[in-house]
Curated annotation (Swiss-Prot):
One of its GO terms (cellular component) is cytoplasm. It is found in: Cytoplasm. Participates actively in the response to hyperosmotic and heat shock by preventing the aggregation of stress-denatured proteins and by disaggregating proteins, also in an autonomous, DnaK-independent fashion. Unfolded proteins bind initially to DnaJ; upon interaction with the DnaJ-bound protein, DnaK hydrolyzes its bound ATP, resulting in the formation of a stable complex. GrpE releases ADP from DnaK; ATP binding to DnaK triggers the release of the substrate protein, thus completing the reaction cycle. Its cofactor is Zn(2+). It comes from Prochlorococcus marinus subsp. pastoris (strain CCMP1986 / NIES-2087 / MED4). This is Chaperone protein DnaJ.
Amino acid sequence: MADFYQILGVSRDADANTLKSAYRKLARQYHPDVNKDPGAEDKFKEIGKAYEALADPETRARYDQFGEAGIGGAAGMPDMGDMGGFGDLFETFFNGFGGQSSQGGRSQRRGPQQGDDLRYDLNIDFKDAIFGQQREINIPHLETCEVCRGTGAKKGTGPTTCTTCGGSGQVRRATRTPFGNFTQVAECPTCNGVGQIISDPCTSCGGNGVKQVRKKLRINIPAGVDSGTKLRVSGEGNVGLKGGPPGDLYVFIKVKNDSNLKREGINIYSEISVSYLQAILGDTVDIITVDGKVNLKIPSGTQPNSTLSLENKGVPRLGNPVARGNHQVLVKVKLPTRITEDERNLLEDLASKYTEQNSSSNSGLFSRLFGKDS
C-alpha cells in the first residue's frame, strides 16, 4: 500500500502550503486531459486521494497513527473550494464531459423521481395494541394537481423549451486555468436543470404540478404492536414527479399506559392484595386482565410477594397472534394493624397449638408468616 507522503513527494512534517504546492504540481502533470499516458488517470486519482487525506488535520492525524485503515478508505477527490473552482472542473473531466455529478448525474433530475416518504405518529390505547384494530387517519400529503395534471402550466398551455440551455438543462462555459483552457459544464440557472420553463404557471398549484391535500386512510394495526413499532403503508407518501412512483407512509405507534396493567414484551404484569387469612387458607379472587375478569386461585400458604401466572393471558406475538405471553400477578399480603379481642384469642390459641406441634422449631407461626416471633 503506497504511502500518501511518498505519493505527493513530501516529508511527513510538511506544512499545508507545501502539501498544496506539491499536489498542484503533480495534478497538472498527471491530469488525464493533459497527460495521455495509460496510467495517468489512475495516478491523478491516487494523488487526489493522498492530498484529501493529508489536507485535513484530523484525517491526517488518524492517517499518521493508523495508516490508511484509520481513515476508513473514505479518501477520494479533495475539496477544491479554495482553489478557484477547480473542483467543478475536475468533476467534469472525470465524468466524460457529460455534466453528471457524483450523486448520479443531473440527467436523472429530469427523469422520473420517486415521491418522498412520510411519517405519521399514532397514539393507541393499551388494549388496542394487544388485540389490534382498524383506525382511520387523516394525513396531509402531496398529490398531482388535478387542474394542470402535474405539468405545472396553466390549463391550455404547457412547458416550453428553455432558451438558455436549449432544453439540455446544462450550460457550458470556457475556463482558463493553469492547465490550459477547459469547458466547464454546470446546471442551467434559468430552468434549474429541468430543460423546460413554465411561462404561464397553473394558478391552482403555483406551477409546482403538485398540491398538498388531506387524505383519509383506513389502516390495519396488527395484534401485538408496541411503542416504537413502525407500520409501512405502501404508496401513500408524496406523489412522484414526472411519472415516478409515490413514496410510502410510515406509521409510528405510541401505546398509552394502563392504570392497572404493565407490559414487558409479550408478558403483562399486575398486582393484587389479599388478606393474611386468604394467603394462609387459600382463596379464589377476580383478576382484571386484557380479556376481562378471570378467576385466579390463591393456593393455601401463598407467601408475600410471590408471583402467580395466568398462562396465555398476555400479549399476542407480533406476526403470530396465536402465540400469547402470560399475565404475571404479584401477590401482596395485607397484615391487619388492629385486631379484636376475639381475633387475638383465636390467634394465640392457634399459635399455642402450632408451637406444641413444632416445639423443636425456634420460630413460631407468626415468625414464619410475618417475620415476627410468636
